[in-house]
């Protein structure tokens, strides 16, 4: 996909983001939302952005770990960081393009074939979802109405892991794929995709990266907690418990519905749950949602667009890197 098409999709998402703002403002009364934004203690915003940044840094650590797991070597750390953070700039694009932009840039900068790196976004989303389930587990016991979303994630994740780790079944499917006339030419890429999936979803990577996701997304829960404090909500363990349920529940719901960047679904979830569990007014809940979504979503988009601009300059100043053979850089799957 060309950068022009990416810009077009991003523009669509910016329009959707503006519509979400208008929708929340209409729901809560525009003048009340403006007043609420004025009353927010903006000195807390750097803490919100700092906590979100820690989440991004830990997720970059996960990206680096996964690159090593599938056997990527010799990729400079600076280029790897630019590649990862550039993906943040496209998380709000339709079709989840941002999830795969990293793999495309990895191919352009390093020559790693897409079939080798494509399982990384899958593993990232799986471990992120499992981490969110762990974060929301305590709150789920207390506020059990949202348990269906959590069950779907756990069951779906378990099915994906079992499918990837069941080598006889996978090999049977690959053999059948080779016999199909229209798709047989992709058999080699499918095998490379499976080899990476097998390595990434092994017990140690799966467990370690899920634990890392608990910590990284925990920083976003803390960011929401700080936003609530900035709105005048009394802090404490009870508020932190409720925040640790609201953010994971809203994030998981938006992930399951596959909306770009969770637009609309996440905002609706955070606003509604804040009213129900925290007793906030419509306007305060809407203001809190707008601020935390700026800090945890749109801030990342801004960082990502800067990184994408730097990557574009980097690519413009060098010769194309030949794509490596898919089987030549494989991970150990023994």
List PLM regions with ranges:
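Predominantly cytoplasmic-facing regulatory/coupling regions of multi-pass membrane proteins
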Residues: 1-85, 142-254, 277-282, 286-290, ...
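Short intracellular "coupling" helices and adjacent cytoplasmic loop segments at the cytosolic face
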Residues: 71-74, 85-101, 105-108, 260
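Membrane-embedded alpha-helical segments of transport systems
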Residues: 86-94, 115-140, 253, 287-303
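Hydrophobic alpha-helical membrane segments of integral membrane proteins
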Residues: 101-105, 118-121, 131-132, 212, ...
